[in-house]
Amino acid sequence: MSLLLLLLLVSYYVGTLGTHTEIKRVAEEKVTLPCHHQLGLPEKDTLDIEWLLTDNEGNQKVVITYSSRHVYNNLTEEQKGRVAFASNFLAGDASLQIEPLKPSDEGRYTCKVKNSGRYVWSHVILKVLVRPSKPKCELEGELTEGSDLTLQCESSSGTEPIVYYWQRIREKEGEDERLPPKSRIDYNHPGRVLLQNLTMSYSGLYQCTAGNEAGKESCVVRVTVQYVQSIGMVAGAVTGIVAGALLIFLLVWLLIRRKDKERYEEEERPNEIREDAEAPKARLVKPSSSSSGSRSSRSGSSSTRSTANSASRSQRTLSTDAAPQPGLATQAYSLVGPEVRGSEPKKVHHANLTKAETTPSMIPSQSRAFQTV
């Protein structure tokens, strides 16, 4: 009798035992959290249904409720408009539907059904999985023969753990999809693969795939190994081009400088004074009239004082040594020419004086003395 009573109590308070379920779903999908009961009595208003969420930080909040024949499903801003009863909750199916899923929906859900003093509890653990974001493929190192190259691949978001896998993409028939034999995987950073001692056979497309329980994403990178000799040739060609350009520029600059120098010398040549140039020669001019003779005399006397002094001394010598004959006019000659500084007056010899005395007898008396111009 006591055993039968115990069984009745257990069946009456079945909700105190409850059930536990774990569900995993991918973000942006739809999920249904199960909750079933046999307490529905449509003719009575004592049925209450309530879903609670306890997040990973231990905070609890009400998701949806049914009470007094009304459904309340806009109780939280995070899940507003995304939660509802999946079926006829009055007939015994109080399952909860969430669409679309978000990472913030993850946690422990509790379904509590109460009617006329009877309770049913149901617990569901929901895990929301996030697909890996599209990874980024990068190369680190030199793409030359004999060098080492590191392939890097990483996703910025996604549910851990994320598994990375590198492989070659077959571009030609017969190519191997496996990594080269001299390749090493960094287990501390699974997205890194080291290719050692590169050769031309390492060239090609490499694909990295990042995956987890929710799905996978991939990226592709091309590896092109270059000859060391070809790089040296390119560097030499660039150096030669630069040197040639500099040489051409230097030649043009020198030509311009030379032309400027020649132009400057041509402009300065007329202004130069030569020290070895000959002085202008003196010439004797016979004046046509007395006025022109006087002007020439004044001009000659003012420009060549030293020559006039020399002529006066010569006249004094003639007057003392030989007196002029009466009736004959003596002629005095003056030198015409530029004044020469520092030059000594020429000496008059006795023979010249005698010749000077006899010369006037052959010239008419009306002739005048020649003056310098």
UniProtKB/Swiss-Prot annotation:
Residues 355-373 have a biased composition (Polar residues). Residues 288-314 have a biased composition (Low complexity). InterPro entries: CLMP, Ig-like_dom, Ig-like_dom_sf, Ig-like_fold, Ig_sub, Ig_sub2, Ig_V-set. Keywords: Cell junction, Cell membrane, Disease variant, Disulfide bond, Glycoprotein, Immunoglobulin domain, Membrane, Repeat, Signal, Tight junction, Transmembrane, Transmembrane helix. Residues 264-281 have a biased composition (Basic and acidic residues). May be involved in the cell-cell adhesion. May play a role in adipocyte differentiation and development of obesity. Is required for normal small intestine development. It is a single-pass type I membrane protein. One of its GO terms (cellular component) is cell surface. Residues 19-127, 135-224 form the Ig-like C2-type domain. This is CXADR-like membrane protein. Its main location: other. Residues 19-235 are extracellular. Residues 257-373 are cytoplasmic. Residues 1-18 form the signal peptide. Disulfide bonds join 35-111, 153-208. Predominantly expressed in epithelial cells within different tissues and in the white adipose tissue. Expressed at high levels in small intestine and placenta, at intermediate levels in the heart, skeletal muscle, colon, spleen, kidney and lung and at low levels in the liver and peripheral blood leukocytes. Highly abundant in the intestine during embryo and fetal development (at protein level). Residues 264-373 are annotated as: Disordered.
